Amino acid sequence: MVDVKTCLDNAQEKMDMAVMYLEEALAHIRAGKASTRLLDGIRVDSYGSMVPISNVAALSTPDARSITIKPWDKSMFRAIEKAIIDSDLGIMPENNGEVIRIGIPPLTEERRRQLAKQCKAEGETAKVSVRNARRDGIDALKKAVKDGLAEDEQKNAEAKLQKIHDKYIKQIEDMLADKDKEIMTV
């Protein structure tokens, strides 16, 4: 027989994962300020394997408009530059032989709108995942009723599941509002 607590815990775990995915996705959407997290998703070919830039170089932000990358191995300059150019970030690296500098240009109004739209799409994906977790939980509870769980226990558990769902949806909406504000602030 399925335990009510297990159903709720499983659903909450799936909802947690959806929120964590959204946090990660929003961190990669630049808001006009330099951040080394902007480069987290970029992989570099290092001796035949694809690794994050942070595994082959030191990353820093000397000011609000630039990122510096200092490769530990001088032979990695080309691979790092190529990976950055091939990414969809729309930034160009400058190599001076010692470090790679990336100037973060101020966002245009049109680009800000595109990024806000991208954030909303990521948020909608997270909301769908949270709703799917709720649906899976409800299905598990209905199956538990067939296995002998009392119907009033099922209804109480569904109400708890709905409250958990609402909390996560609100958290997602708050995250999106914060990111939207960050993007749209000039």
Swiss-Prot record:
Alphabetically, which GO biological process terms does the record hold? Answer: translation; translational termination
Going by the entry's taxonomy, the superkingdom of the source organism is recorded as: Bacteria
CDD domains (UniProt xref): RRF (cd00520)
> Mind telling me which InterPro entries this protein's record contains?
Ribosome_recyc_fac, Ribosome_recyc_fac_dom, RRF_sf
Per the record, its GO cellular-component terms are: cytoplasm
- Spell out the subcellular localization from the entry: Cytoplasm
Keyword Cytoplasm in the entry? The reply is yes
- Coiled-coil zones: none
* Chief localisation class: cytoplasm
Listed PANTHER family:
MITOCHONDRIAL RIBOSOME RECYCLING FACTOR PSEUDO 1 (PTHR20982:SF3), RIBOSOME RECYCLING FACTOR (PTHR20982)
Q: What does this protein do?
A: Responsible for the release of ribosomes from messenger RNA at the termination of protein biosynthesis. May increase the efficiency of translation by recycling ribosomes from one round of translation to another.
Which family does this protein fall into?
Belongs to the RRF family.
This chain belongs to the protein called: Ribosome-recycling factor
Q: Which organism is it from?
A: Bacteroides thetaiotaomicron (strain ATCC 29148 / DSM 2079 / JCM 5827 / CCUG 10774 / NCTC 10582 / VPI-5482 / E50)
This protein's encoding gene: frr
